[in-house]
Amino acid sequence: MEMVVLVDHAGDPIGVQSKADVHGQSTPRHLAFSCHVVDEQGRLLVTRRALKKRTWPGVWTNSFCGHPAPGETLEDAVSRRAEFELGLSIDHITCAIPNFSYVARDASGIEENEHCPVFIARAVSSLTPNPAEVAEAQWTSSSELKSAIDAAPWAFSPWLVEHFTELQPLIAEHIVEAEDDD
């Protein structure tokens, strides 16, 4: 059974609960993460959530999201989910927005209530999306993504809409840092 870490409003752990039980009409705050993957050309990977996903099925979002297991570091969880959702190896995993949190309710009434640090990572392998997680994947520029979010925010996950303006200038910095490390 997959477990998630419950957190207080500061993001500090206060317990655990099964993932299956945590998401509902009144979801307790729990730890999650979002990750944006960039390629060697500086493009961002956006994905459309699989239609069978329990929350926000079919919406476009960042590259992937997930929940760290109890005792798992966020960086290890990011690597694990990149492989699981996208069949992708990543490096240069950087926490760009450590204190991002949001609460949102999808059309089915399920509430998300997440302390959700936002990461940027670099793709180092080819993409093989898991169809149970990802309906579509597309590489795009950050400016094209920002324009699309501004034009049709309803087509994107609420967490992406909420954090992307803060994240956008950090993407270019991450690309330069990754290149400098090589």
UniProtKB/Swiss-Prot annotation:
Asked if the keyword Manganese belongs to this entry, the reply reads: yes
UniProt subcellular location: Cytoplasm
- UniProt-annotated binding residues for Mg(2+): 65, 85
What superkingdom does the record give? Bacteria
GO MF annotation list: isopentenyl-diphosphate delta-isomerase activity; metal ion binding
Q: Which reaction does it catalyse?
A: isopentenyl diphosphate = dimethylallyl diphosphate
From the record, give the cysteines joined by S-S bonds: none
**Annotated residues for binding of Mn(2+):** 23, 30, 67, 112, 114
User: What cofactor is this protein dependent on?
Assistant: Mg(2+); Mn(2+)
Major enzyme class = isomerase
| One Pfam family, short name | NUDIX
Q: What are the alphabetically sorted keywords of the record?
A: Cytoplasm, Isomerase, Isoprene biosynthesis, Magnesium, Manganese, Metal-binding
Q: How is the cofactor bound?
A: Binds 1 Mg(2+) ion per subunit. The magnesium ion binds only when substrate is bound.
User: Which cellular components does GO assign to this protein?
Assistant: cytoplasm
Q: Report the EC code(s) recorded for this entry.
A: 5.3.3.2
Could you tell me which residue ranges the Nudix hydrolase domain spans? 28-162
The main location is cytoplasm
This molecule's function is given as:
Catalyzes the 1,3-allylic rearrangement of the homoallylic substrate isopentenyl (IPP) to its highly electrophilic allylic isomer, dimethylallyl diphosphate (DMAPP).
Q: What is this protein called?
A: Isopentenyl-diphosphate Delta-isomerase
Lineage, uppermost ranks: Bacteria, Bacillati, Actinomycetota, Actinomycetes, Micrococcales
